[in-house]
Regions:
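A general structural signal for well-ordered alpha-helical segments in protein cores
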Residues: 43-46, 67-71, 99-103, 127, ...
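Fold-independent oxyanion-binding glycine-rich loops
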Residues: 1-2, 23-26, 61-63, 88-89, ...
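Conserved ATP-binding module of the ATP-grasp superfamily
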Residues: 112-115, 133-139, 155-175
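A glycine- and small-aliphatic-rich helix-loop capping segment at beta-alpha/alpha-beta transitions
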Residues: 73-84, 105, 155-162
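ATP-binding N-terminal substructure of ATP-dependent carboxylate-amine bond-forming enzymes
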Residues: 1-88
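A conserved helix-loop-beta module that forms one wall/lid of the active-site cleft
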Residues: 80-150
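Short acidic-hydrophobic, aromatic-tinged amphipathic segments that line or gate anion-handling sites
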Residues: 35-42, 117-123, 152-154
Length: 175
């Protein structure tokens, strides 16, 4: 996506970069490096390619491989440890990967954050009642990776209640 293109574009400008591979890449990244047809979550294929091409650094753009532990994968294998991976370990990536985890972390560490309540299909009535205790605008966030689209900001209570029901009905997939 756009983030990966921006990273590749900037990295390609470094005089220290001899060759730049982007996996899987997109139409925009072809102008700055070589796209490689490997899914960002196929750690075995990425590591095999990195070893074959003598790659010194892996910069991870999308959240999905971070949450699934690509950093940990490289760090836990002796043959890959010498390859620098730019990105957090899996537990650190959970701050982005799970809104519930992030809110819990902030609460445990006294980091200021807005009031929240985690809602499931089973607790929808609790969620609707919680919305009534808040003031507009109402912010609803899906828990999980939604490619940057899992947040709704709604001006009225009626809209917030309607959208909460739709979110729990699968609006953002499994998130």
């Amino acid at each position: 996506g756009g983030r990966e293109h921006a990273l590749a574009w900037k990295i390609a400008q470094s005089p220290k970069v001899e060759k730049l591979y982007i996996a899987p890449g997109n139409a925009g990244t072809t102008a700055v490096g070589e796209n490689v047809n490997i899914k960002a979550t196929d750690f075995e294929a990425i590591s095999a390619f990195a070893l074959k091409e003598d790659i010194a650094m892996v910069v991870v753009g999308p959240e999905d491989p971070l949450v699934k532990g690509i950093y940990d994968y490289f760090q836990n294998r002796p043959e890959l440890k010498h390859i620098a991976v730019i990105g957090p370990f899996a537990q650190g990536a959970e701050l982005e990967g799970s809104k519930e985890f992030a809110k819990g972390f902030m609460m445990r560490h006294n980091i200021p954050t807005a009031r929240y309540k985690s809602i499931t299909s089973a607790t929808i009535e609790e969620g609707l009642a919680f919305l009534e205790t808040l003031e507009a605008p109402y912010v609803l966030k899906a828990d999980g990776l939604c490619a940057g689209k899992g947040v709704l900001i709604l001006p009225t209570l009626d809209e917030a209640k309607k959208e909460l029901k739709e979110m729990l009905g699968g609006m953002f997939g499994s998130a």
